[in-house]
């Protein structure tokens, strides 16, 4: 072979792979205006001692089953708008006439915001204003919140330790109490909770005809083993702990933010036991707050980061695997070897096909704050973090339509494919962790996200 021929071979062998030709483009984030008025001025430093005393008096009266109006008047007279966070906390528990109306008026007096006109509740617009303003709380606010919240659920006390990574301003009650049942306990919570489903039996796909082909499942694949979790069961339990392949998984489903995720619960330092995920009954900007039953460590459900407790101190971030939202019929075609959770969940329960009905038809029912206007609030997207750290959002309907038309969708070295009729993301080394969520949820955790557009 001539020297020229050798050189040509080397050049060709070392040439970079061609950049894939992807359809569409990405919309970058920009600053956007909100409908909220200017925030009220707030002082620095501690609360006035008189206001602190009035807060204490009001809390004592609530603990005793009353509501001391004079103490509320004294709080308003103090004129410190930072206390609006505490008033909003109380508005979650006192709604409608009586104390609820008094709290709404007090909030309006301190902040200048109008929140009483909302036909559903003054609580939601009140917190939305505070989030939009990013109004600071005072040092000690979390402990006052602790005094109120532990009246409702004493087990929440373990979450309110000092020096945690929880922004307590954003945490609110989700309307249920803590699920603290031991792993494998199938008894209902005596005081009401969202009960996790632990190690449910599964059946082969050809025995899963009890679930309609056009209904949604959340599909997970580990070690080439595929499992379908029916959406109607996930809407009831919102948390499943099980083993798939060689891995132990905790799979939360936040119905309020449209997001099912799968965490490797053995991905903790060796001094800790396998994490057992449970639903706390609390929310943060409409996203469920989950925790580890063994250590009472709070986790960020969207990121898997431990925010408190021993796992928070160890800076644990649980590893994730992808979850695909697909119809059952199409998932079976793509994964004929898939299994599906048994019809009764292994607990003898009958599940309605649509347990939540039209609950979310009118938008988020809990505070979320301002939402990036690039997409509608509850548009479903598949979110993924690119290899260069850039967050990406692929609107589900538009992306699926483009792929069905035979075009390619992706970003740099990532490509989106159909999986069933859901979406998965694949990189140079195989599948990349991705999951579906409502736009408001993905964008509030990843405000710098790029949005794909056809």
What residue spans do the PLM features occupy?
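Bacterial signal peptide processing site
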Residues: 15-18
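C-terminal motif of bacterial Sec signal peptides marking the signal peptidase cleavage site
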Residues: 11-13
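Mid-to-C-terminal functional-domain signal that highlights helix-capping/loop sites
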Residues: 20-64, 70, 84-454
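Sec-dependent signal peptide recognition
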Residues: 1-9
């Amino acid at each position: 072979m001539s020297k020229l021929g050798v050189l040509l071979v080397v050049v060709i062998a070392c040439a970079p792979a061609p950049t894939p030709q992807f359809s569409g483009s990405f919309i970058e984030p920009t600053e956007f205006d909100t409908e909220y008025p200017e925030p009220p001025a707030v002082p620095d430093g501690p609360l006035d001692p008189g206001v602190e005393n009035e807060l204490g008096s009001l809390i004592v009266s609530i603990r005793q089953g009353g509501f001391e109006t004079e103490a509320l008047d004294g709080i308003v007279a103090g004129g410190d708008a930072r206390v609006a966070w505490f008033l909003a906390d109380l508005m979650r528990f006192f709604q409608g006439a009586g104390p609820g109306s008094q709290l709404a008026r007090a909030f309006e007096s301190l902040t200048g915001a109008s929140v009483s006109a909302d036909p559903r509740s003054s609580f939601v617009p009140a917190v939305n204003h505070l989030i939009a303003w990013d109004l600071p709380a005072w040092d000690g606010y979390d402990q006052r919140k602790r005094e109120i919240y532990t009246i409702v659920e004493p087990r929440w006390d373990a979450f309110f330790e000092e020096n945690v990574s929880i922004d307590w301003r954003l945490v609110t009650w989700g309307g249920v109490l803590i699920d603290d049942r031991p792993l494998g306990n199938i008894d209902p919570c005596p005081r009401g909770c969202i009960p996790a489903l632990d190690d449910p039996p599964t059946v082969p796909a050809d025995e899963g005809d009890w679930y309609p082909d056009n209904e949604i499942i959340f599909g997970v694949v580990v070690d080439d083993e595929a499992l379908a979790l029916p959406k109607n069961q996930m809407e009831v339990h919102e948390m499943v702990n099980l083993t798939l392949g060689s891995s132990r998984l905790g799979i939360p489903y936040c119905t309020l933010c449209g997001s099912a995720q799968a965490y490797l619960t053995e991905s903790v330092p060796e001094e800790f036991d396998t994490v057992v995920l449970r639903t706390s009954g609390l929310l943060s900007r409409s996203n469920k707050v989950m925790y580890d039953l063994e250590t009472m460590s709070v986790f960020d459900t969207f990121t898997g980061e431990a925010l408190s407790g021993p796992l928070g101190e160890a800076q644990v971030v649980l590893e994730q695997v992808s979850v695909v939202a697909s119809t059952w019929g199409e998932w079976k075609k793509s994964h004929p070897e898939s299994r599906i959770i048994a019809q009764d969940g292994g607990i003898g329960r009958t599940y309605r096909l649509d347990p939540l009905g039209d609950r979310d038809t009118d938008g988020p029912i809990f505070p979320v704050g301002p939402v990036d206007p690039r997409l509608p609030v509850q548009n479903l997207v598949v979110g993924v973090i690119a290899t260069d750290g850039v967050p990406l959002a692929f609107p589900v309907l538009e992306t699926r339509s483009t792929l069905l038309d035979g075009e390619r969708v992706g970003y740099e070295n990532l490509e989106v494919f159909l999986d069933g009729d859901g979406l998965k993301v694949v990189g140079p080394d195989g599948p990349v962790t991705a999951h579906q969520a409502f736009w408001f949820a993905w964008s509030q955790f990843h405000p710098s996200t790029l949005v794909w557009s056809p």
